[in-house]
C-alpha cells in the first residue's frame, strides 16, 4: 500500500511541468487508491491559468482539497511561531500531513524540504518528506 501524499506548491509545479518522477509517484498512489491531499493555499500558489495548466488540472482531479479555515489558520500561526518559520502555506502542508499521519503513513512531496522538516519537527511528527 502506498503512503498518503500531501503535495506542496513545488510538487504542483513539477506536475504542471510534466516532471516524470513526480507523475510516477502520483500514478502509483492513484493505482493504490492512496489518499492524496493538497491544501487550498497550495492550489492558490500554483494555479495561474486553468486553460493552460491541463496537466495540473488532471493531477488535481486525483487529490482531495484540504480547506484553509479560521481554525487551521490559527494553528498554522502557532506552528510558525514554534518552528521559527514564516510560510503560512508550508505550515498548512505540515498540518495536513500531520493529521493524516495519525492513521496512515504519510509523505510530503515538496521542493522545499528544509522548512517542511522544521515544521514537522515542531509538530513532533515523523512525517516523511520527499524532494521533487
Segments predicted by a language model, with ranges:
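Residues that scaffold the ATP/ADP-binding catalytic core of kinase and kinase-like folds
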Residues: 15-16, 76, 119
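Acidic, PIN/NYN-like endoribonuclease modules and their adjacent C-terminal/linker elements
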Residues: 2-4, 102-132
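Acidic, metal-associated active-site segment
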Residues: 46, 87-107, 111
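Short, well-structured N-terminal submotif of metal-dependent ribonuclease cores
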Residues: 1-38, 45-63
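General small-molecule cofactor/ligand-binding pocket signal
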Residues: 37, 66, 128-130
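Short, hinge-like loop/turn segments at secondary-structure boundaries
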Residues: 53-57, 83, 126-127
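Alpha-helix/helix-capping structural signal
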Residues: 10-11, 41, 71, 114
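Acidic catalytic patch
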Residues: 42, 64-84, 91-95
Amino acid at each position: 500500500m502506498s503512503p498518503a501524499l500531501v503535495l506542496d506548491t513545488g510538487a504542483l509545479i513539477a506536475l504542471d511541468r510534466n516532471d516524470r518522477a513526480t507523475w510516477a509517484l502520483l500514478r502509483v498512489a492513484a493505482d493504490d487508491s492512496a489518499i492524496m491531499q493538497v491544501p487550498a493555499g497550495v492550489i492558490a500558489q500554483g494555479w495561474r491559468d486553468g486553460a493552460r495548466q491541463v496537466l495540473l488540472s488532471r493531477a488535481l482531479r486525483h487529490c482531495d482539497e484540504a480547506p484553509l479555515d479560521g481554525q487551521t489558520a490559527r494553528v498554522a500561526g502557532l506552528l510558525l511561531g514554534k518552528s521559527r518559520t514564516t510560510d503560512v502555506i508550508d505550515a498548512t502542508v505540515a498540518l495536513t500531513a500531520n493529521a493524516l499521519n495519525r492513521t496512515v503513513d504519510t509523505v510530503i512531496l515538496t521542493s522545499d524540504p528544509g522548512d517542511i522538516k522544521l515544521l514537522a519537527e515542531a509538530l513532533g511528527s515523523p512525517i516523511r518528506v520527499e524532494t521533487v
